[in-house]
Amino acid sequence: MSEILELEAKSRTEFGTGAARALRREGRVPAIIYGAGKIPISISLEEKEITKYYRRPAFISQLINLTIDKKQYKVLPKAVELHPVTDIVRHVDFVFLEAKTQKMEVPVVYEGKERALGVKRGGYFNIIKRRVILLCDINNIPRNVTIDVTNMPIGTSLKSSEVKLPIGCSFVTKKEFVLATIIGRKGVKTEIEGEQQVAGAMQ
């Protein structure tokens, strides 16, 4: 599960392009927190710190304790604007967390896909879902969903009903869907059929 980051922020009362440029000259980044029916709060963050955290894996699904003027808020990153050349963070949108659960889009990691049974037989591992939307307990937001696919044979599909999700998480959609398949390359079917014919002749 994700660790909870601790961030310090300052309130800001000046807005617009000029104010944002002035902040960046001071080594700070403009940001805003909104959602949950609350009045938005405009803040600034230390540029080096927020850029460092942004470059960590799965920053968008990262639960953050944000302290502003000695008051603490639980927030999630919603959107990040980057400098087009340097990839330094230029602006961040956060959302307030008030409910006990939160919809999250998290990456899927297919562990062992290069050595899956079906791949060893000449199949191709076809990823259909690289990210999935989950409903998560805000205290147990995963960095990703890791699925072991080493035993997946050729000509099969991995369905959502077969996936064991992290504790406190469920798929938002109740309808079953396919995350990945292993499809046969040209010649694989012929090879399998040949093996089946040999096996039949030996019986």
Curated annotation (Swiss-Prot):
UniProt keyword terms in alphabetical order: Ribonucleoprotein, Ribosomal protein, RNA-binding, rRNA-binding
Alphabetical list of Gene3D superfamilies matching this protein: Ribosomal protein L25, beta domain, Ribosomal Protein L25, Chain P
One Gene Ontology MF term: 5S rRNA binding
UniProt keyword annotation of Ribonucleoprotein present: yes
Gene Ontology cellular-component annotations: cytosolic large ribosomal subunit
GO biological process terms, semicolon-separated: translation
Segments passing through the bilayer: none
Family: Belongs to the bacterial ribosomal protein bL25 family. CTC subfamily.
Complex and partners: Part of the 50S ribosomal subunit; part of the 5S rRNA/L5/L18/L25 subcomplex. Contacts the 5S rRNA. Binds to the 5S rRNA independently of L5 and L18.
Stated role: This is one of the proteins that binds to the 5S RNA in the ribosome where it forms part of the central protuberance.
Name this polypeptide is given: Large ribosomal subunit protein bL25
